[in-house]
């Protein structure tokens, strides 16, 4: 199985390589190439087998091919075209420049250096030769100029001499022809019959000229009119034999070519009308192409703007959209309904332009059909008039010959008379039958059909190309919308994730803040409790200090009192001692 897959892959690569190298348009047109390779290019082409199966297999034509073509155009071809555009873009942006730089740097530069050396070494040599060649041509021209002038002078003199001789010969020939013609026409009594009516002349003057020349040739076989008049032993029917032959041939020829004359006049009329009509239609088709091209450019521009960027206006807070390059501001945000409306607008304009061309075709075809019917009716009337005149006039001529023959009591003329009348009746019936055929004749409008086929092919090609391009653009738009929607969905999901993360962060911060506040509150409570305890301690210490102070003051007062008492006692003691020393009695208080 693996070998089979490798074999198929190798065979496919080999076939496509041969097709790429040999099966191009130039190679196919070259008849000197190998027949087997041309056959290979033909039989390896999928379009050949597709056309072959469409032509020879009804089931493939009606069932398989439409479904396969529709699915291919819908699911495969747009992606192939997009891949080709991407590959061409890669080639133009990177590969082409890289290849050109490589070729220019590695090969062209070397060849240019070698060529410059060759040019410098041979330039002087070729310059000398070109100067010598110019001098030689100039000398040759001077030598041949006089020789050519002499030849022209001799040739002009010879031409003038020959022209004079030819003019004299032509005048003599014209005189002889006029003399012979007048002699022949005066020798016959049926000149009116041989001269065609104006109606028959308008159908085809060439047939009359042929018939007249044939009559003159028949007259020439009799040498002169004198010989005809010197044969009294011939009957009237025998004398009118040449006239009968000429008349039968004229009527038979013109009758047989009546339909051909009609087709020829219609063809000339169509060729005359189709040329300006073709110019008008070409202008309409070119206008049609330009309109479609403008609509396609508008659609392509909007499809390219699907892949856009957005920003928020800092002043208004409005979302502003920019093209992919980020420089051009978009008038609106490109949506699927908007692109669908553009596709519908293109289809409606395409249909309107196509209807305009179709209406023009229909009106012009109706006008041409009306004029062709008039030409047909005119030809029928002309043929009827010509047939009536030719039949009636010749019947009178035959009746006159019949009377003259009866006057001479010629019994031998009865068989000739029967034969000529039988041929006359047969030809009359043929003229009537051809008239009926001319009335029912289906006019050939080959130029018109060919022109309409070309126009239809042109319109079909435009329609096909436009539909294929619309399919490609529709697929491209769908891909861009899918990519943008996927990107927007990812951005939306990313925003949701970021928003969720932000909310979680805010919630976490809030929780941390609450915890910190609670901690701060606890710390504040602890601090307050410490402050209260410290205050109570300080108050207690102050109270204790106050009590100690009071105790100290009381102690000091007690000490002061004791000191005061001691002092007083000391004073009393001193007074006592002083009194004792002075021998005075103690004070009364002390005595008490």
Curated annotation (Swiss-Prot):
Family listed: Belongs to the SHE10 family.
Record-given protein name: Outer spore wall assembly protein SHE10
Source organism (scientific name): Vanderwaltozyma polyspora (strain ATCC 22028 / DSM 70294 / BCRC 21397 / CBS 2163 / NBRC 10782 / NRRL Y-8283 / UCD 57-17)
Subunit structure: Component of the mitochondria-localized RNase mitochondrial RNA-processing (RNase MRP) composed of one single RNA encoded by the NME1 gene and at least 31 proteins. Absent in the nucleus-localized RNase MRP (NuMRP).
Coiled-coil regions, chain positions: 354-385, 448-583
A biological-process GO annotation: sporulation resulting in formation of a cellular spore
Region (Disordered): 507-592
Protein's UniProt keywords contain Transport: no
Assigned keywords, A-Z: Coiled coil, Mitochondrion, Ribonucleoprotein, Signal, Sporulation
GO cellular component, one term: ribonucleoprotein complex
Domain of life: Eukaryota
Protein's job: Involved in spore wall assembly. May be a component of the mitochondrial RNase MRP (MtMRP), a ribonucleoprotein endoribonuclease involved in the cleaving RNA transcripts to generate primers for DNA replication in mitochondria.
Main localization (coarse): mitochondrion
Compositional bias segments (type: Basic and acidic residues): 507-580
Location in or out of the cell: Mitochondrion
Signal peptide: 1-23
């Amino acid at each position: 199985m693996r070998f089979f897959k490798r074999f198929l892959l190798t065979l496919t690569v080999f076939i496509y390589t041969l097709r790429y190298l040999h099966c191009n348009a130039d190679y196919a047109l070259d008849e000197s190439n190998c027949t087997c390779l041309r056959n290979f290019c033909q039989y390896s082409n999928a379009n050949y087998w597709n056309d072959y199966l469409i032509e020879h297999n009804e089931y493939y034509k009606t069932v398989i091919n439409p479904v396969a073509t529709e699915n291919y155009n819908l699911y495969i071809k747009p992606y192939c075209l997009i891949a080709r555009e991407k590959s061409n873009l890669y080639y133009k942006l990177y590969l082409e420049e890289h290849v050109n730089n490589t070729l220019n740097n590695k090969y062209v530069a070397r060849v240019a250096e070698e060529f410059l050396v060759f040019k410098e070494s041979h330039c002087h040599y070729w310059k000398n030769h070109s100067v010598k060649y110019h001098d030689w041509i100039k000398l040759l021209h001077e030598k041949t100029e006089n020789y050519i002038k002499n030849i022209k002078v001799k040739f002009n003199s010879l031409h003038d001499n020959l022209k004079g001789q030819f003019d004299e010969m032509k005048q003599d020939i014209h005189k002889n022809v006029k003399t012979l013609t007048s002699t022949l026409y005066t020798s016959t009594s049926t000149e009116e019959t041989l001269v065609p009516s104006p109606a028959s002349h308008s159908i085809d003057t060439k047939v009359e000229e042929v018939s007249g020349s044939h009559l003159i040739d028949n007259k020439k076989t009799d040498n002169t009119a004198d010989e005809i008049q010197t044969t009294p032993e011939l009957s009237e029917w025998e004398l009118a034999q040449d006239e009968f032959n000429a008349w039968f041939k004229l009527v038979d020829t013109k009758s047989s070519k009546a339909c051909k004359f009609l087709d020829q006049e219609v063809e000339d009329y169509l060729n005359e009308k189709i040329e300006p009509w073709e110019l008008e239609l070409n202008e309409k088709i070119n206008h049609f192409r330009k309109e479609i091209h403008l609509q396609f450019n508008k659609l392509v521009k909007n499809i390219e703007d699907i892949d856009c960027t957005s920003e928020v206006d800092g002043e208004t807070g409005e979302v502003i959209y920019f093209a992919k390059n980020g420089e051009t501001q978009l008038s609106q945000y490109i949506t699927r309904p908007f692109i669908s409306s553009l596709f519908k607008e293109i289809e409606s304009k395409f249909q309107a332009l196509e209807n305009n061309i179709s209406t023009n075709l229909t009106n012009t075809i109706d006008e041409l059909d009306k004029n062709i019917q008039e030409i047909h009716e005119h030809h029928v009337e002309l043929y009827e008039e010509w047939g009536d005149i030719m039949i009636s006039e010749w019947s009178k001529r035959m009746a006159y010959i019949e009377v003259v023959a009866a006057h001479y009591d010629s019994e031998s003329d009865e068989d000739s008379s029967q034969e000529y009348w039988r041929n006359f009746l047969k030809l009359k019936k043929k003229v009537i039958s051809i008239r009926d055929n001319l009335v029912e004749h289906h006019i050939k409008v080959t130029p018109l059909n060919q022109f309409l086929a070309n126009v239809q092919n042109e319109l079909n090609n435009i329609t096909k190309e436009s539909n294929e391009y619309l399919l490609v653009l529709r697929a491209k738009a769908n891909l861009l919308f899918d990519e943008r929607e996927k990107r927007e969905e990812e951005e939306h999901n990313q925003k949701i994730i970021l928003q969720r993360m932000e909310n979680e962060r805010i919630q976490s911060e809030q929780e941390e803040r609450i915890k910190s506040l609670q901690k701060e509150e606890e710390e504040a409570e602890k601090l307050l409790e410490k402050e209260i305890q410290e205050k109570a301690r300080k108050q207690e210490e102050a109270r204790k200090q106050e009590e100690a102070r009071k105790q100290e003051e009381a102690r000091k007062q007690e000490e002061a009192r004791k000191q005061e008492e001691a002092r007083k006692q000391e004073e009393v003691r001193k007074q006592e001692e002083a009194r004792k020393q002075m021998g005075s009695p103690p004070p009364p208080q002390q005595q008490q």
